[in-house]
Amino acid sequence: MAYFRRNFYGGRRHYYRRRNAYTRRRYRRVRRRHRGRRFPYFKQGKRRRTRLLHVTDPRYKAHCTITGWVPIAMTRIQLISQPFTVDTLSPFHVYPGGYGYGVFTLEAMYKEHLMKRNRWSRSNAGFDLGRYLGTWLTLVPHPYFSYLFYYDPEYGNTFEFKKLIHPAIMITHPKTILVLSNKRGGNRRKWPRMWIPRPAIFADGWEFQKDLCQHGLFAFGWAWVDLDRPWMADISKPAQTIDPSTYDKKNDMINKVPNMWWKEAANDWLTEWGRPQGSGVTQQFNQLAMAGPFVLKTNKSEYVNTELLQIILFYKSHFQWGGEFLQDKVLADPTKIPPAQTAYYQQAGQTNLYGSPYKPLSSGLHDSISELPIASPPQNPHKYTVRPSDYDKDGILTEESFRRLTDSPYTSDGGHSFSSFSTASDPLEGTSRYARPLGRKTTREPSRRRKRRRRSPSPEDEETAPIPPKSNSEPSISGPGRATRKQLLQRLFRRLLTSSPQ
């Protein structure tokens, strides 16, 4: 193979390789002393072999993608540097802060599904195992303010994680994403998108969904950042804190506290409600004290045109459901499922196979608005699942597992024992879909048919009629239909004795 580079004469050469300008010098071959292997290939007379790790997957597997959105920030511009606070007295105002953090879990995603905030591509019904693969996050920039977003799959204590959510600390971390505002970064740029792998503590094996809900998938934190004034804001009037009683007579440092010109008792009702409210600056002073490098300042700027700041987050998590149940699969009759196109091309007045008018599809793969039914929350696996922990050391089902598997789903009141609704609110109670419970006395309506008259027995009936027993020790016979073999033999023997000649 020819390769081209500049030669000593300049320009590009047009031959395979450069001609040797001098005869190549030949060296004597020197024998090399070989050292032994650092890691012995043979140990104690046996060759080292690679051990294989076998992982058994469940028989049935299904891929599920959970796509949704979640609001992560809703703050006010006046209280960016303060934490989330709520008034303890009326009117109970809510003051959100300028940073936040949270943890993504499978249980939280199920609760978000109940609020119609996410969509599951595959239902978890019929599966008791689960495996987490990872999550895609898409960050939406704010029109006027920039913020920092930080994620950590291997997080520890959430209280210690909260201490590190500061713009001056997060801005130097490699896992921090700087989301510039549209005012600074432009409106045509792409939204930041990142892939968060599963934590290192998660092995490649499967877990029960109930156990998977107890593990946090990843933790995240966010905080507003000020890149225009990272150190301090524009100060118009400095706060006087040396002698408030002399310099600021009507500009008290604490709201609703009167000027202390003389000593008096501290009456709570008088201090809180009896005096007029002054124009205190304690709140503004605390904001300046709590602010630090890169903290968003609350002074008015050219970018501030709204008081309530909001951020949303889009996520797309990947899971796998698996397992095998000792139950039949629920199938649909393919002859009774109309095509998806018929719901859009039917005219008014036409009916389907059942005689009812066509209606738009409410479920199915062709409907982009419908949702798959999530039968049960992931933290409640199916009760009829046979797990490895249900067997003892000899491979036999334990007593508790056998009782759980053989328990009837119907109770004495007619309702399901594993459902939350009662018998009174059950719309299907009393129909043919429910089995008749044990121990309940059912009353039948009197028959309108005319009762048949009893006729006198014929001679043939008298011969075949049962003979009453002679003593109490003999078994009683209620009829020829219920007679056992022993009773029939006794009846035949007694008839032979009565019919024999004297």
Swiss-Prot record:
Report the InterPro entries cross-referenced here.
Answer: TTvirus_Unk
* Lineage per the UniProt record: Viruses, Viruses incertae sedis, Anelloviridae, Deltatorquevirus, Deltatorquevirus tupai1
Physiological role: Self-assembles to form an icosahedral capsid with a T=1 symmetry, about 30 nm in diameter, and consisting of 60 capsid proteins. The capsid encapsulates the genomic DNA. Capsid protein is involved in attachment and entry into the host cell.
Source organism per entry reads Torque teno tupaia virus (isolate Tbc-TTV14)
Which family is this sequence assigned to? Belongs to the anelloviridae capsid protein family.
- Give UniProt keywords alphabetically: Capsid protein, T=1 icosahedral capsid protein, Virion
Recorded hits in Pfam families, A to Z, give: TT_ORF1
Output a single Gene Ontology CC term carried by this record: T=1 icosahedral viral capsid
Compositional bias (Basic residues) spans? 447-456
Q: Where in the cell is it found?
A: Virion
Region: Disordered; residue ranges are 369-392, 405-487
Segments passing through the bilayer? none
Q: Which domain of life is it from?
A: Viruses
- Write the protein's name: Capsid protein
